[in-house]
């Protein structure tokens, strides 16, 4: 997609199956610090706990019934076993007063030329693949992705369905993107003092080339 002033855009979506099962704190720093031309939009949509618990219980009973009739040498056995273990993990988390969210990640890639855009897109996919993650291009959904990337706090319905990933409160906390020990920009605004090392916190909030995270919706 080419938008005014010959700036080329493309949009990547992390599908529901494209996330790692386990992540460490600050894992989104990989995307936030990806470099120039990479912007990240993260959406969190909290779901009603009572409805989630009811639906989760039903799905667990269905999966337990299916696995009884499946041989342990069948290729479906591992998928069912993983689904059951994930279901109990979510059930235990909800019982411990955690909330249930759907998370979506939309990545905007921009460049001054089509060749550079293709290179950045491929490098971004390789970067995620090296971390056992996957990103897909929003083919034929570029307009919807562009509107979703605007600061309107609204992810298009089909993009949401394709990329939603269930997470609990602790998993949401691990998505906090700012993990740098120091933060000091040359032309920034003094916000305060870092209590851990007494360094000044000076941030240029208008420099979009440095701070790539444009939207967090909870």
Regions found by a protein language model. Give the residues of each.
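Non-catalytic substrate-recognition/targeting regions of SAM-dependent transferases
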Residues: 180-182
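Conserved small/polar residues in nucleotide/adenosyl-binding loops
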Residues: 1-5, 216-218
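Extended, folded cores of ATP/NTP-driven motor/assembly subunits in large transport
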Residues: 4-178
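Glycine-rich phosphate-binding loop of nucleotide-binding enzymes
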Residues: 186-216
